[in-house]
Amino acid sequence: MAPAKSHITHPPCSLQLKAIALGVACAAGIHPLQVAAQDETAVIEELVVWGRSLQLLGSADSASQGVVGYADFSTRPLARVGELFEVVPGMIATQHSGPGKANQYFLRGFNLDHGSDFSTFFEGMPVNFRTHAHAQGYMDLNFIIPEIIERVDFKKGPYFANTGDFSLAGTSSMKTYDTLERGFVEVTVGSGDEIRVVVANSFSTEQGSLLYALEHQQTNGMFGLDQDVRKYNGLLKYTGEIGGIPSQLTLTAYDSEWISTNQVPQRAVASGQIDRFGFIDPDLGGQSHRYSLSGRFELGEWDLTAYASAYYMSLINNPTYVLNDPINGDEFEQEDERLLFGGSLLRKGAFDFLGLQAASLVGAEVRYDDVQELNLFNTRSRLRYDSVREDDAQELSLSAYAESEFMVSEKLRLTTGLRVDYIRFDVEALRPQNSGSDNDALLQPKFGLAYRLADSLEFYANYGHGFHSNDVRAAVNRIDPVTGEDTEAQDILVEGRGGEIGFRYDNLRGFNVTLTAFELATDSELVFVGDAGTTGPSDPTRRSGVELNAFYSINDRLVIDFSAARASGHFRGLPDGENSITDAHENVAAAGLSYVGTQGITASLRLRYFGDAALTEDESVMKEDSTLVNAGVSYAFGAWEMGIDALNLFDAEDDDIAYFFESRLPGELEAVEDIHFHPSNPRIIRAMLRYSF
């Protein structure tokens, strides 16, 4: 069930005074959900806070930049934690395998795989993993407890000096609550034998506050094979002073194991061998854990962030069945174990330049990935019988950036920035020929313009260079670990260049809309083929598109939101008709209606449209579009709240994802090219009971 509604209480006042009070509270760093009435004799009313209603005119650096949070999350039914990011306009989160695996993400014509060009930070700690056993930029959000997320700040495009690796399509920063207005215990039961329990509370300490949250989820899911999910999450956050220094410390712990069904071949369903929710290999699944500690410290004019994380993943997969080995099958295990350390230093300031007022931003970042196990094994019934590759890798990155914003006039802001990233790495492989070390660096200019056309309207133009890193093994590999053939070393830092123009309109009375046109070109999109343990480059690409995003607060209780995006992507240098980027969905749309009543009723109705996509470069094979509708309603009375969610309300038989490739089923004499798809969940009903204290 969607979390309970978030609200603040205070004496009645005009809408203008409410907006001013909220703006002052946010600017002062006061938690808007904790502002309480000071006049106990006044009549109390609720004010619902929507992150998308926060006024960004005069402060945002681009039209596509935004904030989501507060009631944006608490009124939204979520099928999976990755759908938190579907509040970012144009973003889609799907799944092509089990629930313990990172989601598949789509944005701006990118199939982001598991996060390759969209970076995420949780309390200052990077979520994406470099040189990962399954996918470069692997972004697993399963360690996050949705009820504790206060807000997400997002940016799109490579226009910002403080965003680096994996940020070509965009970046996001997630912040958890410092304190809760009330503690709660929440129990959810649902279809597929699902049980989920969340407990959270906060309390004051001598010099600050301490928040804790615990989550347990188990489910067998809605597929033909029981998923047997067992997930445990914990969070402990301290906000206050340490040795007189304003600080935040966040400790998270995540552990999960699961069984999964992978995408299945269309021919097996058409022949009646399996149904849409069936499976070919019953041994797929995995286990993972992540234990992290991050901290933020205010050191005078400087802000310091530091983090450390211990991570493990074992993933059993088999997308091709018996294509490569008719006797043992093609099942394999990917294993990743690492330690991650890093931090950043940031300073904001102000200065005069040729009589112009200016704001400055300077910073530095360091990150070290110590990947101790980076392995690929052939398996049979989950048991290893052959090693394809066993590697370890150490990857160090250093970054520095500077950005200045000049107030050319009362209406015009100009921003210039420069960023440099340096990466050094060392790889030790099972095959000595694939061992080695190297380094690379990249300089990235950034530019921005914002012009206030009117009190309620602002124009933006942005341009910048960015990059994504690739699996460092690609730079030193000399021998294909499967075929034994010679391979060519690849670049580690792949540059991209992008620009956008757009408008932001906000009438300051509950209605805002943004319109953006963008283009993004990359030099290459190096793809790591996890089941073969190899890496290969694609041709250069170009994507362009438009995005529309609108939010309207009809009154204090009822809001509507709508977003739509269209993106076209092609490989550069290839002839027309043979240059489509596969699995790059052109059209995406979402709409929602949310109501938070005065009598304890909260309701939400949401629609998500995911357009069709080419599965081959010549568009001869296409994935069909999909439309899903989710709904939720809850009723709060005293300290209690009960509710129900319906996910995929109309039980649409759509697909989450589809691919086109060769596979061979047991009993087939040769390989067959086919669509392999993973269906969306059928209708799921969840009931929730919450007690607040």
Q: Each predicted region: which residue ranges?
A:
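Gram-negative outer-membrane beta-barrel transporters
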Residues: 347-350, 409-410, 414, 422, ...
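C-terminal beta-signal and adjacent terminal beta-strands/loops
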Residues: 4, 560, 612-614, 634-693
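Membrane-embedded beta-barrel scaffold of Gram-negative outer-membrane proteins
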Residues: 199, 296-299, 303-319, 452, ...
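Extracytoplasmic beta-strand/coil segments of soluble accessory domains associated
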Residues: 82, 86-129
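Short acidic/polar hinge/loop motifs at secondary-structure boundaries
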Residues: 126-156, 174-175
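Transmembrane beta-barrel wall of Gram-negative outer-membrane proteins
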Residues: 184, 189-218, 223-261, 284-296, ...
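Short strand-turn segments of transmembrane beta-barrel domains in outer membranes
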Residues: 153-161, 170-203, 214, 221-222, ...
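Face-selective signature of the C-terminal outer-membrane beta-barrel domain
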Residues: 241, 245-254, 286-430, 450-452, ...
